[in-house]
């Protein structure tokens, strides 16, 4: 079992309860080593709390992974991010370049790195892997816009992993709720084994029978499993489409514009995700019997 968290609401008491319940591992996302830029990216002042939480995780004896969410506006601090992971006594660092679906797709121009940035990051990671062997394991996820073949997202839909949201929904991957036509069963209502084996959501893209051409006749169909369903749906509107990051996808052209413009345009401001809170009209709450003045 693995907890993926921002770290801003975790207490030592809660971590101890997680440990006693059998939690195996914790991952904490860190947006940058520069506190000011970290909070600009996150849109929330939580950098110091994240670092404190990392210390608490190690204090209670849980293994720590630092999730370094990297992109165009923080890759210049990749070396210091690696150093920070060592300082925090992390067992593992995931240098994960932003994947462009969900809210990241809305900020694609602000996030997508240049090819030069990506090549430099790859060199830094390869050097650090050698230097820190036996000290820090480093996973490296590149933006698949630059790839010729898609990644095997989650090792294939419904094959190896599942994700449980704070509300109890059981998902085949972290971003699966972006597939808004699917319904996800809740662990509060049904046994986890039943959801894994029988739910419509987990069976929707499991295996290869759902695949169109060219995936269906591809010799890699049981290697990359058709790529990312969330990305295919976000970029094409067709959940069954071959992932556009594949060089053989009929939708590969949707990546041409962002890739041709990266580094040439001015970096836009971030579009932040905000929770809209209903405000009472003229100071009158929604439970009031009074009518607002016209």
Feature map (PLM): residue ranges:
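C-terminal accessory region of radical SAM enzymes
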Residues: 114-146, 175-225, 235, 249, ...
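Acidic donor-binding/catalytic loop of UDP-sugar-dependent glycosyltransferases
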Residues: 12
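Radical SAM enzyme [4Fe-4S]-AdoMet core and its adjacent flexible, acidic
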Residues: 16-25, 29-171, 175-190
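Short cysteine clusters
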Residues: 153, 168, 173, 215-218, ...
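Short cysteine/histidine-rich zinc-coordinating motifs and their immediately flanking basic loops
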Residues: 227-233, 239-240, 257-261
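Short Fe-S-cluster ligation motifs
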Residues: 200, 243-288, 293
């Amino acid at each position: 079992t693995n907890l993926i968290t921002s770290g801003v609401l975790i207490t030592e008491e809660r971590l101890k309860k997680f440990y006693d319940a059998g939690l195996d591992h914790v991952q904490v996302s860190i947006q940058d080593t520069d506190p000011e830029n970290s909070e600009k990216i996150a849109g929330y002042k939580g950098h110091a709390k994240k670092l404190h939480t990392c210390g608490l995780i190690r204090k209670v004896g849980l293994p720590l992974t630092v999730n370094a969410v990297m992109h165009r506006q923080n890759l210049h601090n990749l070396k210091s991010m690696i150093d920070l992971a060592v300082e925090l006594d992390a067992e593992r660092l995931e240098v994960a370049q932003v994947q462009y679906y969900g809210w990241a797709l809305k900020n694609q121009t602000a996030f997508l790195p240049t090819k030069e940035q990506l090549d430099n990051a790859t060199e830094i990671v390869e050097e650090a892997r050698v230097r820190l062997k036996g000290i820090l394991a480093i996973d490296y996820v590149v933006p698949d816009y630059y790839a010729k073949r898609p990644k095997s997202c989650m090792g294939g839909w419904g094959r190896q992993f599942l994700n449980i949201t704070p509300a109890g929904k059981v998902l085949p991957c972290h971003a699966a709720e972006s597939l808004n036509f699917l319904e996800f069963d809740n662990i509060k209502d049904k046994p986890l084994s039943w959801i894994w084996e029988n739910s419509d959501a987990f069976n929707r893209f499991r295996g290869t029978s759902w695949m169109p051409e060219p995936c269906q006749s591809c010799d890699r169909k049981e290697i990359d499993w058709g790529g990312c369903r969330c990305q295919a749906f976000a970029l094409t509107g067709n959940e069954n489409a071959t992932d556009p990051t594949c060089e053989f996808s009929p939708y590969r052209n949707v990546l041409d514009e962002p890739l041709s413009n990266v580094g040439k345009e001015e970096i836009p401001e971030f579009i932040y995700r905000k929770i809209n809170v209903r405000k009472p009209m003229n100071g009158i709450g929604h439970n009031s019997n009074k009518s607002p003045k016209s």
